[in-house]
UniProtKB/Swiss-Prot annotation:
Gene Ontology CC entries for this record: cytoplasm
The protein, known as: Imidazoleglycerol-phosphate dehydratase
Gene: hisB
Pfam families listed in its UniProt record: IGPD
Major subcellular location class: cytoplasm
Organism of derivation: Mycolicibacterium smegmatis (strain ATCC 700084 / mc(2)155)
Biological processes, Gene Ontology terms: L-histidine biosynthetic process
Annotated pathway: Amino-acid biosynthesis; L-histidine biosynthesis; L-histidine from 5-phospho-alpha-D-ribose 1-diphosphate: step 6/9
Length: 206
C-alpha cells in the first residue's frame, strides 16, 4: 500500500474569463484558504475542504463584474483536475464513499466511486433553486450552478458522483448540505484502507 505517497497537487488555469490556482493535499487536516470573489462560494469551498479534511487553497480572479458564473465553474474544473492528480495511482484507497448530511430542515446525500469513469447524477432540488440567488458583499451565487459545480468536479476528477436532495426548503441550507455531503463522501472514498494492498478493482486498474 502506498500509504506514504505524496497526495498533493497544484493546478493553474488561465483563460480570458478567469485565472485559477488550486493547491490540494488529500492527507491534510482541513486547513483552507479560499478567495474567489464570490463570498458564498468561498463559504462552500471552505466547508468542502474542512469536512473532507483536505488542505485546500483556492485563489481565483474572474470577470465577476459581469457575473460569478465563469469563476465558479472554472474553479470547479480546476479543483476536479487537482483531485484527479492528487489521487495518483489510487492504491490502497477505499474507493467508495457516501454521506447523508442534514442542514436544519434539509437533507442531502452524496455517493462517490473513484472509478476512473466520470459520471454525474444530480436529483431532488426544488424547482425554485433554478432562479434563486444568494447575495453577499461581492458577486452573488446563483443556486442553479450547484449542478454545474459538482458535474465539473466529477468529470475533471474522473469520478462517479451522485448528489441528491431528499428534502429541504431553504436554498442556502440545501446547497450547504450538498457541499458537505460531497465533502464527507470524498473523505471516505480517498482514505487509505489497511486491508487494501493495491488498486481496489478486480481489473487491477482505475
Amino acid at each position: 500500500m502506498s500509504a506514504l505517497a505524496n497526495r498533493r497537487a497544484r493546478v493553474e488555469r488561465k483563460t480570458k474569463e478567469s485565472e485559477i490556482v488550486v493547491d490540494l493535499d488529500l492527507d491534510g487536516t482541513g486547513v483552507v484558504d479560499i478567495d474567489t470573489g464570490v463570498p458564498f462560494f468561498d463559504h462552500m469551498l471552505t466547508s468542502l475542504g474542512s469536512h473532507a479534511s483536505f488542505d485546500l487553497t483556492v485563489h481565483a480572479k474572474g470577470d465577476i463584474e459581469i457575473e460569478g458564473h465563469h469563476t465558479v465553474e472554472d474553479t470547479a474544473i480546476v479543483l476536479g483536475q487537482a483531485l484527479g492528480q492528487a489521487l495518483g495511482d489510487k492504491k490502497g484507497i477505499r474507493r467508495f464513499g457516501d454521506a447523508f448530511i442534514p442542514m436544519d430542515e434539509s437533507l442531502a446525500h452524496a455517493a462517490v466511486d473513484v472509478s476512473g469513469r466520470p459520471y454525474f447524477v444530480h436529483t431532488g432540488e426544488p424547482e425554485s433553486m433554478v432562479s434563486f440567488t444568494i447575495a453577499g458583499t461581492g458577486a452573488p451565487y446563483h443556486t442553479v450552478i450547484n449542478r454545474h459545480v459538482f458535474e465539473s468536479l466529477a468529470f475533471n476528477a474522473r469520478i462517479a458522483l451522485h448528489v441528491r436532495t431528499l428534502y429541504g426548503r431553504d436554498p442556502h441550507h440545501i446547497t450547504e448540505a450538498q457541499y458537505k455531503a460531497v465533502a464527507r463522501a470524498l473523505r471516505q472514498a480517498v482514505e487509505y484502507d489497511a486491508r487494501v494492498t493495491g488498486v481496489p478493482s478486480t481489473k487491477g486498474t482505475l
